């Protein structure tokens, strides 16, 4: 009851002052805060993802906060939109929380603060099922960031192939061609590029055959690592 009174009183003050800030906060107790997020009526693409990222940055400023409960039902929208927009919000929140702290030693806790979030909603199961799609993207983004952040003397071609092999558990078909196989295929131009390195040259193909029949023509990406 006291908490509701505090929040309602705070909301009235915000309305009276015509505050335009996206995020505001109020102290509930010595260890708890209530964050109020203002949702715009006019929204551009990726609005909720960006808002989630902004919210993470806002919350991270408070040293004593390591976890938060996020109430989705306060978003005044129909069920389908609420599920979609809240999933996007959590996606942005989690993406913003990424840090590559493997080699950090000084102020590591301060620089790599993690904040757990718990969804509080009557549509929890729907949101969790919908978020699986976003979580797969998030995991891919984090893996990519981890790999590109590694120094080249650590993530050499051999080590890189070992990391790629791990993706086979997701259903990807992975083939790794070493120098012997590349020579046999006559791929001498590729081998020539690697002659200046002490590390062995590899070529990796990754295939995903999970598309539906009506997807259209196959897609192929070619890149040099």
Protein language model annotation of sequence segments:
Residues 1-219, 224-225:
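Short amphipathic alpha-helical segment within the helicase RecA-like ATPase core
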